[in-house]
Design a protein with these regions (language model features):
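Shared catalytic-loop signature of beta/alpha-barrel
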Residues: 221, 226-262, 266
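Short glycine-rich loop/turn motifs that provide flexible caps or phosphate-binding loops at active sites
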Residues: 211-212, 268
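Extended, intrinsically disordered, low-complexity segments
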Residues: 28-39, 189, 197-198, 250-269
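Alpha/beta enzyme core
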Residues: 1-33, 49-70, 74-209, 215-233
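A structural signal for short, well-ordered beta-strand elements
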Residues: 47, 213, 257-260
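Short glycine/proline- and acidic residue-enriched helix-loop micro-motifs
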Residues: 36-45, 182
Length: 269
């Protein structure tokens, strides 16, 4: 369809750690005691050996496409899961995206400790692999620019702006918490655009990748004009289908022709 690379669905820290505990002889009850919030998720998605399934996905993907295949790990702290990064590399992943999602709801937690944990997680992963590692950030930091610089100094080859927490909702008839909208809205693109512009103007020494709320070829053009090296799309493909990538590329090429650009580099901000 014309994509330049594929980022696979994230494998979650809880999936990896629970699989390791199974191998070490822990019971299901022990695992759920350790990860109570993940019980429903694990019951639904743990079919066979989750790590092996993910590695198989990498290998099979490499066989059918000639573009980079990027593995993704969703994590919130350092743990046993880190050693699995090497296995994903060995399975053929061309790069790794760390989708770090630390929920800061503890009022006693020093905000600086959160940023230090991001750096620490990245460094531990970097020790185990030699493929490029990018970090996917949230937008709720006091100083995103400083964190971005510190992550690049710690070895990040790319920064992805931004990740997205699953949003809760409440069913007022059943008076229960339910899952909210799981895909991004086009309006979310504007915040990404702001921060891509700000960080690119500061010459962050790594690639900047725009994510969240990118729905059209026009959205992609805006992000590149702002300074993004790459642009990620997901929600629009759920809504419009994988083949929509062709339309987005066609729209970008038509715009480039109108403005006499021969290469994407010619109009990157």
């Amino acid at each position: 369809a014309g994509a330049g690379a594929v980022i696979l669905k994230s494998i979650f820290e809880e999936q990896i750690s629970s699989e390791i505990k199974r191998e070490e002889g822990y019971s299901e009850e022990d695992i759920y005691d350790a990860y109570p919030e993940a019980q429903e998720y694990l019951n639904t998605f743990m079919r066979g050996t989750e790590i092996e399934i993910y590695e198989k996905l990498i290998r099979e993907s490499k066989k059918v496409v000639d573009i980079p295949i990027i593995a993704s790990i969703n994590c919130s702290d350092k743990g046993e899961w880190i050693r699995i990064a090497k296995e994903l590399q060995d399975a053929g992943a061309d790069a790794l995206e760390l989708n770090i999602a630390i929920a800061a709801f503890d009022r006693d937690l020093d905000p600086r400790k959160i940023e230090e944990e991001y750096i620490s997680i990245l460094k531990e992963v970097e020790k185990n692999i030699n493929i490029p590692v990018s970090v996917k950030l949230g937008d709720h930091f006091t100083n995103i620019s400083r964190l971005a610089f510190n992550l690049t100094k710690a070895g990040a080859k790319g920064l992805v702006l931004f990740n997205r927490f699953y949003n809760p909702d409440i069913n007022i008839e059943k008076m229960k918490v339910v899952t909210g909208n799981s895909i991004s809205a086009p309006e979310e693109n504007h915040n990404t655009l702001r921060w891509i512009s700000l960080l690119s103007s500061q010459e962050i020494p790594c690639e900047l990748s725009a994510s969240r709320g990118v729905y059209t070829g026009e959205d992609v053009i805006k992000q590149i004009l702002a300074g993004a090296q790459t642009v990620q799309v997901c929600s629009t493909l759920y809504r419009n289908g994988i083949e929509y990538v062709k339309q987005m590329n066609a729209d970008i090429e038509a715009w480039m022709d109108r403005h006499n650009f021969d290469n994407v580099k010619d109009f990157r901000g």
